[in-house]
A protein has these predicted regions:
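Membrane-interface alpha-helices at helix entry/exit sites of multi-pass transporters
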Residues: 108-109, 141-154, 316-326
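Membrane-embedded alpha-helical segments of transport systems
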Residues: 120-124, 148-170, 325-337
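Transmembrane-helix boundary and interhelical linker motifs in polytopic inner-membrane proteins
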Residues: 96-105, 130-144
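Extended non-transmembrane interhelical loops and adjacent amphipathic helices
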Residues: 111-140
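Interfacial segments of multi-pass membrane proteins
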Residues: 136-142, 303-319
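Transmembrane alpha-helix interface/packing and boundary motifs in multi-pass membrane proteins
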Residues: 120-122, 282-301
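Predominantly cytoplasmic-facing regulatory/coupling regions of multi-pass membrane proteins
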Residues: 1-113, 171-291, 330-351
């Protein structure tokens, strides 16, 4: 998912970045400012509702959620819900740091931008619409410039996801897979090849990440890119200390994800050691990051990948599926619902 987002590029248009000429009439601006938000809210709400309604195993998972509110282990579900706010709070802080070169925004505004990004991401291929949801909270002249900056944040997250996923694959290769435990369609030979390929690309991404300034200057020398350099110039200003800080936030956010999964796996009695489950979660995140998906099939992919991986450790298929569904509901659907509400108050243009 993150890799597709990194390759995604939004071309200049009136929605993201306007020329300085005031070519929109006042009535048109009023329409965009006061009607687009509510229209987007209705569309997003209906789309999210249809996605939830069409998901398999949802009624059973909902019953499991209701039962989980009671009992000695109910704190785990509450903790997972609380960690959702921590998770997106870390992402909001990253966004605030990333865009400060083009516009200073408050943490709360960054938080709303993240939630709105999730609302649109849930309705677009591989979540690429997330960028649009975020940049509408910036001034119209800064939106396209912020797209390049947001890619830096996605790159930091994919570096963490790939690095931890590779370690997880090594653990899977050496401690889990044997004659009776194997992943369907993936033998040790292909697994070794996958690890080498992923290691190569992780190194490439790390080099790109910490050489953004040099790389941006190099790209600016390409003739047909020269007239667009204004949109990527801010990438030159990132110091390695800032990049390290963003990478650290991505790593902490990643750990929050892992803890959420571990808590729910324990809640639903998926019996295995914490180390085994933890590294398997890392492999799962890697799969979700590199396999393209469409919104309506995202939960299906999560569920199938979870069954394949955690099925190597436990026969509790129902607990594995419940975990995948509830994580999707808490981390994806709830923020998307909040974001669809926030978008009502968005003003796309100055009056």
């Amino acid at each position: 998912m993150f890799i597709t987002q990194i390759l995604f590029y939004i071309k200049p248009n009136a929605f993201l970045c306007l020329p300085k000429k005031n070519f929109l009439k006042r009535k048109q601006k009023i329409f965009f400012n006061y009607f687009i938000g509510p229209i987007a809210f209705i569309w997003l709400s209906f789309s999210i509702y249809k996605q939830i309604k069409n998901q398999p195993n949802l009624p059973e998972a909902w019953e499991a959620i209701k039962l989980s509110f009671y009992g000695a282990s109910s704190w785990k579900l509450y903790a997972v819900f609380a960690l959702m706010f921590v998770n997106w709070g870390l992402e909001a802080k990253k966004w605030q740091l990333l865009v400060k070169g083009v516009q200073t925004i408050s943490f709360f505004r960054a938080y709303r931008a993240i939630f709105t990004g999730q609302a649109i991401a849930l309705n677009t291929l591989n979540g690429v619409g997330e960028y649009v949801g975020r940049v509408v909270y910036l001034k119209d002249g800064n939106r396209l410039r912020a797209v390049a900056l947001s890619i830096v944040g996605s790159l930091s997250q994919i570096i963490v996801t790939m690095a931890m996923g590779i370690i997880g694959l090594i653990y899977l290769r050496t401690n889990v897979l044997d004659e009776t435990h194997h992943v369907q369609g993936l033998n040790k030979f292909w697994l070794d090849g996958l690890m080498y390929a992923l290691s190569f690309w992780t190194i490439i991404f790390i080099l790109i990440y910490f050489q953004l300034s040099w790389l941006t200057k190099l790209i600016e020398k390409i003739p047909f890119v020269a007239k667009y350099t204004f949109y990527i110039q801010k990438l030159e200003d990132f110091h390695w200390k800032e990049l390290t800080r963003i990478l650290l936030l991505s790593f902490i956010r990643y750990l929050v994800f892992v803890v959420q999964y571990l808590l729910l796996l324990e809640l639903f009695k998926v019996d295995a050691s914490v180390m085994q489950l933890g590294w398997m979660v890392c492999v799962l995140f890697l799969v979700l990051a590199i396999v393209p998906s469409i919104p309506i099939a995202e939960l299906g992919l999560r569920g199938e990948a979870s069954k394949q991986l955690f099925g190597l450790l436990s026969t509790n298929t129902l607990g594995i599926v419940f975990t995948a569904v509830i994580i999707w509901l808490i981390n994806r659907v709830i923020p998307a619902i909040a974001g669809s509400i926030f978008i009502i108050g968005v003003r796309l243009f100055k009056k």
